[in-house]
Amino acid sequence: MKKAIIGKKVGMTQIFDENGRVIPVTVVEAGPCVVVQKKTVETDGYDAIQVGFGELREKLVNKPRRGHFAKAGVSLRRTLKEFRMEDVANYNVGDEIKVDTFEIGDKVDVSGVSKGKGFQGTIKRWNASRGPMSHGSKFHRAPGSMGAASDPSRTFKNKRMPGHMGAKNTTVLNLEVVKIMPEKNIILIKGGIPGPNKGTIVIRNSVKA
């Protein structure tokens, strides 16, 4: 059975296992999410559910989206995501998806938008090697060779160059759920996940599990 939920990254901390070893964990406020729309093969050509997360004031929502929520009979939500599901018949519009969907020990994939780093050079962005920093060298952190001059007289596509770093959709695979607190809608995931604190993330079953 596929599992998926939208959440908000709270931050990182550490817990101790039964042997006293330190485990770094990320705290995520996951759900409750509400099913806003159900899509089926008959109506849309594929099976999926559209899920909303996070409360939102009416003045911040445009008229078409307000109508979309009104049709579903649910309160306004800040984030909408669509999840492909094989068991879509088990869901109805208005159903809540809570953090206890997952269990301790589950392997999950976490998706989010990575932290933006702005414009960065090749050393930070691509882990390129730098030149000598002393002894008369004038080559320190420059990009280096970008291609031949007369032939082919251009820089090849996909050449690793300076540019905007971060702020991209990123997924970390095969993380472990170490603790769940359903009364607080909190889930603790072993290791780090993409994005800044308060960033929106999506937790799914691991594709490798």
Swiss-Prot record:
Gene3D superfamilies reported for this sequence: 3.30.160.810, Translation factors (2.40.30.10)
Keyword Ribonucleoprotein assigned: yes
SUPFAM superfamilies associated with the record: Translation proteins
Keywords for the protein's UniProt record, in alphabetical order: Ribonucleoprotein, Ribosomal protein, RNA-binding, rRNA-binding
GO CC list: cytosolic large ribosomal subunit
Top-level taxon of the source organism: Bacteria
InterPro entries per the UniProt record, alphabetical: Ribosomal_uL3, Ribosomal_uL3_bac/org-type, Ribosomal_uL3_CS, Transl_B-barrel_sf
GO molecular function: rRNA binding; structural constituent of ribosome
One GO term of the biological process aspect: translation
Region feature (Disordered): 127-153
Described purpose of this protein according to its UniProt entry: One of the primary rRNA binding proteins, it binds directly near the 3'-end of the 23S rRNA, where it nucleates assembly of the 50S subunit.
Oligomer status and interactors: Part of the 50S ribosomal subunit. Forms a cluster with proteins L14 and L19.
Family: Belongs to the universal ribosomal protein uL3 family.
Protein name: Large ribosomal subunit protein uL3
Organism: Clostridium perfringens (strain SM101 / Type A)
Gene name as annotated: rplC
